[in-house]
């Protein structure tokens, strides 16, 4: 379905520079777009691509349009303060227009306990299991093999992709998106040591601590494929509104993730950690348990966080990749730091003795 720039602006705002009747039916990158496609400029370093793009129209910020000057002549633009966000909203619209409607109803192979409550407008796919006391609200879509445990609520308009498991006693807010293979509400990693003795004489075992809390997820949360969120030991693990979690993320029991925080793939967050609002956690970050990150904290990829970071800012502890030979030389220096320290101390002592400086 093609829409004019005028129609897009009526729906999403912005101002038109060029032909308001220019039609676009899809989106593409600046360097690949053709007539009938909408591109966007989010990074000024690609400004030169706007001059050569074949796109029918370009989403652009006012300051970047000014930089184009005469090169903008004859081209079509939607001018908006945030072209990237505008692009995302238009992309969502095109996806919705192209998606075939799913008819409400329950697939014959689904298993639904009589004590569960499923809205008439819900879409329940093949081999879905819904246990007693579960509530499936209006417009929910549960794809094949989804499991919803007893007493769990899935909020209105949510979409759970195939093979998602939501254990008992959890709550997922409205408009959530949970991708394939995610597990919500599995037991937290809680074991009490019951050992006697030391070393080889040590005897005893680990005693499992029942995890009697749940998981509470706010509205507009998205959870990536194969991500796991553990239930709380006593109180709930909490994911606040509009949190976005990538694939293969582990969130331990009793954590609280603040609203509008984003967490990239393979991050691991140990139990009882609190992350503030509007934080950004990079890929493969590891965060120790029982620490607190304040609002607006950014932790870069592969960093390890072992203590609280209460102040907003950017934090890094990862070592960036370097040439292998350079790495070996650096590693050799690190191994010899103790010797170098001792040599420097000896030199300082000798120099102080020559000066008669007994305080050194």
Curated annotation (Swiss-Prot):
Cellular component aspect of the GO annotation: membrane
Keyword hit for RNA-binding: no
Species for this entry: Burkholderia multivorans (strain ATCC 17616 / 249)
Uppermost EC category: transferase
EC nos: 2.3.1.191
Family membership: Belongs to the transferase hexapeptide repeat family. LpxD subfamily.
Taxonomic lineage of the native organism: Bacteria, Pseudomonadati, Pseudomonadota, Betaproteobacteria, Burkholderiales
The protein's name: UDP-3-O-acylglucosamine N-acyltransferase
Tree of life domain: Bacteria
Gene3D superfamilies for this protein: 1.20.5.170, Hexapeptide repeat proteins, MurE/MurF, N-terminal domain
Keyword Lipid biosynthesis found: yes
List of catalytic residues: 253
One example of a Gene Ontology biological process annotation: lipid A biosynthetic process
One example GO MF annotation: N-acyltransferase activity
Annotated catalysed reactions: a UDP-3-O-[(3R)-3-hydroxyacyl]-alpha-D-glucosamine + a (3R)-hydroxyacyl-[ACP] = a UDP-2-N,3-O-bis[(3R)-3-hydroxyacyl]-alpha-D-glucosamine + holo-[ACP] + H(+)
PROSITE patterns in the record: HEXAPEP_TRANSFERASES
Keywords: Acyltransferase, Lipid A biosynthesis, Lipid biosynthesis, Lipid metabolism, Repeat, Transferase
Pathway listed: Bacterial outer membrane biogenesis; LPS lipid A biosynthesis
């Amino acid at each position: 379905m093609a829409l004019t720039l005028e129609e897009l602006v009526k729906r999403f705002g912005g101002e038109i520079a060029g032909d308001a009747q220019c039609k676009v039916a899809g989106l593409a990158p600046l360097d690949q777009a053709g007539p009938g496609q909408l591109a966007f400029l989010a990074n000024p370093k690609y400004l030169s691509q706007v001059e050569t793009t074949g796109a029918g129209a370009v989403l652009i910020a006012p300051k970047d349009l000014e930089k184009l000057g005469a090169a903008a002549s004859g081209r079509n633009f939607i001018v908006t303060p945030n072209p990237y966000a505008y692009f995302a909203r238009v992309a969502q619209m095109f996806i919705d227009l192209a998606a075939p409607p799913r008819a409400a109803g329950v697939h014959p192979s689904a298993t639904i306990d009589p004590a569960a409550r499923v809205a008439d407008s819900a879409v329940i796919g093949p081999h879905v299991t819904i246990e007693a006391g579960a509530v499936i609200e209006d417009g929910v879509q549960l794809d094949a093999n989804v499991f919803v445990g007893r007493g769990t609520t899935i909020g209105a308009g949510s979409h759970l992709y195939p093979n998602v498991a939501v254990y008992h006693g959890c709550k997922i807010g409205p408009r959530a998106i949970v991708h394939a293979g995610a597990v919500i509400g599995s037991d937290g990693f809680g074991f009490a040591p019951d050992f006697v003795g030391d070393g080889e004489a040590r005897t005893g075992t680990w005693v499992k601590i029942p995890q009697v809390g749940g998981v509470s997820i706010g509205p507009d949360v998205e959870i990536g494929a194969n991500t796991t969120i553990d239930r709380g030991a006593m109180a709930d693990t909490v994911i606040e509104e509009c949190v976005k979690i990538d694939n293969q993320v582990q969130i331990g029991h009793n954590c609280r993730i603040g609203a509008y925080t984003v967490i990239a793939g393979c991050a691991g967050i140990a139990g009882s950690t609190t992350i503030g609002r509007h934080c950004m956690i990079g890929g493969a970050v590891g965060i120790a348990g029982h620490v607190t990150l304040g609002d607006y904290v950014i932790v870069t990829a592969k960093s390890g966080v072992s203590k609280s970071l209460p102040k907003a800012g950017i934090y890094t502890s990862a070592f960036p990749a370097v040439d292998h030979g350079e790495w070996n030389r650096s590693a050799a220096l690190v191994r010899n730091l103790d010797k170098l320290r001792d040599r420097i101390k000896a030199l300082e002592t000798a120099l102080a003795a020559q000066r008669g400086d007994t305080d050194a």
